[in-house]
Amino acid sequence: MTKTSEIAHLFRTLKAPAAARATPKLAERARSEDWSHERFLEAVLSAEVASRESHGGESRIKAARFPARKTLEEFDFTFQRSVRRTVVEHLGQLDFLHSRENVVMLGPPGTGKTHLAIALGIRACLAGQRVSFATATEWVAKLGEAKRHGGLEAELRRLSFVPLIVVDEVGYIPFDPEAANLMFSLVSARYERASMIVTSNKPFSGWGEIFGDEVTATAMIDRLVHHAEILSLKGDSYRLRDKDLGSPPPVDIG
């Protein structure tokens, strides 16, 4: 067994398969480029760390339960001109997450809110952060179930340790008073403790109608936006960009 093969075998014994796979090529390169021992060791260990981070990121993406896979690089800024690329790229650096701030995206259906929310969530997963994604209706259902079993406080406490949760589609279905209170509890429990990304098809002025109570809506908005980046997306639906909705089909009168 050559020394290179022996090193690769030892890495496999240590359950470092990526390092084992990388060793032969890196050893050859190290010899040809006259690397120091330290540089060679760093390169091999970096290969293992990168592999583990990638696999860990995939596990976190799966656990987050995103409805689709989206990236910031795929976002069509030529179609959606109401949001600046520089703002989105800055959000993609995840400073808001480390500062425990929020991101709120408002705009009509189809303008890219969910795409951006998912993409930022996936970026966070790949950066080593746990994320949980659900629609507003799904969050209310989860919290309602916890409350019925006497575990609401425990569930809110558990969620407070998740660095980022995404609440999608606030406003598509109005909340009854209990649902509104549950959503308020979620926002309050995370206030200045952990980040949220919230998307809504309604402007803040319409949230009183969503939650059935102006006081609750105002208190919730206050907590969400106190430390937040707010994106207002405008324009037509991206999903309908190639659809001709202006002309009715011809009527056969023969």
Predicted regions and their residues:
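Solvent-exposed alpha-helical segments within well-ordered globular domains of core cellular machineries
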Residues: 5, 9-12, 21-24, 42-43, ...
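Interdomain "pre-motor" coupling segment immediately N-terminal to P-loop NTPase/helicase cores
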Residues: 8, 12, 16-67
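Generic structural signal for secondary-structure transition and capping sites
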Residues: 16-19, 49-50, 96, 164, ...
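AAA+ P-loop ATPase motor domain of ring mechanoenzymes
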Residues: 42-95, 99-102, 234, 238-248
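Conserved P-loop
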Residues: 83-161, 208-210
